From Swiss-Prot:
Alphabetical list of CDD domains matching this protein: Obg
Record protein name field: GTPase Obg
Domain OCT span(s) in chain numbering: 350-428
Originating gene: obg
UniProt keyword terms in alphabetical order: Cytoplasm, GTP-binding, Hydrolase, Magnesium, Metal-binding, Nucleotide-binding, Sporulation
């Protein structure tokens, strides 16, 4: 089964917890704190494997969680960093954050890697908190939680040439006779439901990858006839081969077919109609095909080359393949967006996240609810089993301005404050 879009959950491994320990060893006076740091959690990494052709594996396993780092140990021994979770994906996979809709990675080359969910850093042991005022601290940090998110994987096939056209115009037959591909061929619409790739080689030794894309119909850019699933595979092609049925047996006018398909390509955006296009007048072995071709050429205003062929009798195929190879030699990788769009839409990720430290809301029952990534991360990294850690957390909250913000919201002694699933009293 060909799967080209799937939604999965990924989570980086949590960092290992730091340790509270002290050195008690003979002949070592004033040993002091000796708790080691926790190890870093594993990253979730996607790696391109050119042997894969579909996202089928993600259909059955949709949750990926890297392992956590090892906890710190006594004698200032740090926990081991966890191994990364490496997941293989086919070339042409685009990874998008399901929440923000931002593209995380566009994976096209064999061996290319991208970190999709980073593991959390390890918590610090008590030796990290030793100061002249507190030479024997009884506190440590829990490991930082790993990044977690839902992502959408979208496969856009990597082909040099894309065959487009209405259903049953002969695209699959054409691919089957010019390459070793064996697509399903039958006399009904939408026989082809998934892209088929074939390696084509011309008589002079030039080769390229051709994709037989499922048939398009009017309204495809709006999703009609599964149009979105089909059109996404045209995005990476450098040359478009537009196959038109000249027999007229379907009762449609070939020129109207041509206009309809090009309108769908232009409506899909990504400047698909600006790419080199070759018109293939197929089924020229049929009785009225020659007459229909002449009428088509009279109406045609675009400066695209027209090649009359018959995929069944193989008439005209040699000239067509030479023209496709020539077009590819003169056509570089086509940019999906122009410079202005890139300037407007590209997001630069930096180490400094401009995030709101915390938010305060109030439930109908009068409970003040705290939220925010920074505050929640601080809460999760605090070891509440130790008094010093609790006091440090309270100081950090005051430093972030949480206490003052609660007072401004009307919080008084004894009011209930909720953070995640935990509740505590506000003390002014």
């Amino acid at each position: 089964m060909f799967v080209d879009q799937v939604k999965v959950y990924v989570k980086g491994g949590d960092g290992g917890n730091g340790m509270v320990a002290f050195r008690r060893e003979k002949y070592v006076p004033k040993g002091g704190p000796a708790g080691g740091d926790g190890g870093k959690g594993g990253d979730v990494v996607f790696e391109v494997d050119e042997g894969l052709r579909t996202l089928m594996d993600f259909r059955y396993k949709k949750h990926f969680k890297a392992i956590r780092g090892e906890h710190g140990m006594s004698k200032n021994q740090h926990g081991r960093n966890a191994d990364d979770m490496v997941i293989k994906v086919p070339p042409g996979t685009v990874v998008t954050d399901d929440d923000t809709k931002q593209v995380i990675a566009d994976l096209t080359e064999h061996g290319q890697r991208a970190v999709i969910a980073r593991g959390g850093r390890g918590g610090r042991g008590n030796s990290r908190f030793a100061t002249p005022a507190n030479p024997a601290p009884q506190l440590s940090e829990n490991g930082e939680p790993g990044k977690e998110r839902y992502i959408v994987l979208e496969l856009k096939v990597l082909a040099d040439v894309g065959l487009v056209g209405f259903p049953s115009v002969g695209k699959s037959t054409l691919l089957s006779v010019v390459s070793s591909a064996k697509p399903k061929i039958a006399d009904y619409h939408f026989t082809t439901l998934v892209p088929n790739l074939g390696m084509v080689e011309t008589d002079d030794g030039r080769s390229f990858v051709m994709a037989d894309l499922p048939g398009l119909i009017e309204g495809a850019h709006q999703g009609v006839g599964l149009g979105h699933q089909f059109l996404r595979h045209i995005e990476r092609t450098r040359v478009i081969v537009h196959v038109i049925d000249m027999s007229g047996l379907e009762g449609r006018d070939p020129y109207d077919d041509y206009l309809t398909i090009n309108q769908e390509l232009s409506e899909y955006n990504l400047r698909l109609t600006e790419r080199p296009q070759i018109i293939v007048a197929n089924k020229m072995d049929m009785p009225e095909a020659a007459e229909n071709l002449e009428a088509f050429k009279e109406k045609l205003t675009d400066d695209y080359p027209v090649f009359p062929i018959s995929a069944v009798t193989r008439e005209g195929l040699r000239e067509l393949l030479f023209e496709v190879a020539n077009q590819l030699e003169n056509t570089p990788e086509f940019p999906l967006y122009d410079e202005e769009e890139l300037t407007q839409n590209r997001v630069m990720y930096t180490m400094e996240n401009e995030e709101v430290p915390f938010n305060i809301t109030r439930d109908p029952d009068g409970v003040f609810v705290l939220s925010g990534d920074s505050l929640e991360r601080l809460f999760k990294m605090t070891d509440f089993s130790r008094d010093e850690s609790v006091k440090r957390f309270a100081r950090q909250m005051r430093g972030m301005g949480v206490d003052e913000a609660l007072r401004e919201r009307g919080a008084k002694d004894g009011d209930i404050i909720r953070l995640l699933e935990f509740e505590f009293e506000f003390i002014d």
